[in-house]
Amino acid sequence: MRGYISDNGIYTYHGIPYAKAEERFVTATEPDSWDGVLDTTEWGPISPQGAILGGSANEEDNGDNNCQNLNLWTPALDDGKRPVMVWLHGGGFSSGSANGGNTDGTNLALNQDVVVIGVNHRLNVYGYLDLTEYGEKYEHSDNAGLTDIVASLDWIKENVAAFGGDPENITVFGQSGGGAKVLSLMTSPYAEGKFQKGIVQSGATETLGVTFATKEQSLAITDKILTKLGITEANIEDIQTVSNADLQNAATEALAETGAEFEVPLAIGDGYGMEWGPVIDGDYLCIL
């Protein structure tokens, strides 16, 4: 693959595919191979952005469900076995990305002699809509966003040595929602052995507006969304082609209604409401 060298000598790669999600709400698979040289000089696609803290999603959003890509910064392409730091962005589990200036790993790689990686993954309804009652295809749909992150760790462990990193010295770290993602990985048996350390920056669950849904809550959200969209078990595959605007609008309403039903306090202000996040299913995510 072809990246570029920054002005201060850091090897930089944007949009490296670590998996692919050809369908919504389905666990991503290995990325396609490519012929020739893969250009990784431009940012890759990010997840559609969802509502957060009771707001509304952007109906003009041009995000992509197939957003499984990462950005990488390294001081050298040698066998230096540098520590690897994997950044999980904030924005709850609903918004944000690993792209852009405020997630650029150049300075950290330069000043600390580490390999820095930022991960893009599915968010909001794309990452956490619980369709597990609709067949094996949707087995981990309730935690699809987490399955993306775990897939990125698999790619990193397998390939980071080629970028001067140590696959046995991987730290996941993140702020706010990113910190909560670190906590999620710490509880998931599917992430076991894929990283060695974690840093949680203001990402405490329950007390900072980041809550994990129970199975009862996640299924209630799903029932409301499908009803609003006119989707039943008989035509469940229509969920694959519903417009992003309709899907996000239904999701925003369902989160508010389910929060009121289960009396989940809003993170900010009075009243009730829920945010997108992982589901404690006893399998992919266990009780904290």
Model-derived segments and spans:
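A conserved short beta-strand
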Residues: 192-205
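Substrate-access "cap/lid" subdomains that shape
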Residues: 206-288
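Non-catalytic accessory segments of hydrolases
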Residues: 1-146, 167
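Short glycine-enriched nucleophile-adjacent loop
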Residues: 179-191
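A short beta-to-alpha transition loop/helix N-cap that caps and shapes the active-site region
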Residues: 125, 180, 204-212
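Alpha/beta-hydrolase fold nucleophile elbow
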Residues: 83, 156, 163-176
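Alpha/beta-hydrolase active-site loop
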Residues: 67, 138-162, 216-224
